[in-house]
């Protein structure tokens, strides 16, 4: 049987999250969006860098995610770029997250936005904040990898 083509594609990544947090678990959540937001996502007018997820009354909300409206947005709708977006997940997953987030030091951060079967999805992670020395270790590790790649590249020439 033929394999179905991969219809998912990345809209935006939160690269700063990997620098600031250790990821424990990853989850995928749906997004409740307005029409102008979907159009802006298709154009890639989104910023996740300062985003975070809160749990309020047993529901998940994405805060700090900027979806900038297109210049051609409708005139009868006043778009709010910093609007709080509701995330959709199963109740049992949300209950599990509530228990883990209540532990000291854990938070929920958005990792990326992507399309899956024509719908916008947000990948979120249960994360623990890195200390300053951990961030320095991450930088050293990244620079070490770059140096190895540079040496290997020069050897192959």
UniProtKB/Swiss-Prot annotation:
Its main location: cytoplasm. InterPro entries: SmpB, SsrA-bd_prot, SsrA-bd_prot_CS. GO terms for molecular function: RNA binding. One of its GO terms (cellular component) is cytosol. It comes from the Bacteria. Pfam families: SmpB. The keyword Coiled coil does not apply. Keywords: Cytoplasm, RNA-binding. It is found in: Cytoplasm. GO terms for biological process: trans-translation. SUPFAM superfamilies: Small protein B (SmpB). Residues 130-157 are annotated as: Disordered. Required for rescue of stalled ribosomes mediated by trans-translation. Binds to transfer-messenger RNA (tmRNA), required for stable association of tmRNA with ribosomes. tmRNA and SmpB together mimic tRNA shape, replacing the anticodon stem-loop with SmpB. tmRNA is encoded by the ssrA gene; the 2 termini fold to resemble tRNA(Ala) and it encodes a 'tag peptide', a short internal open reading frame. During trans-translation Ala-aminoacylated tmRNA acts like a tRNA, entering the A-site of stalled ribosomes, displacing the stalled mRNA. Belongs to the SmpB family. This is SsrA-binding protein. The lineage of its organism: Bacteria, Pseudomonadati, Pseudomonadota, Betaproteobacteria, Burkholderiales. The gene is smpB.
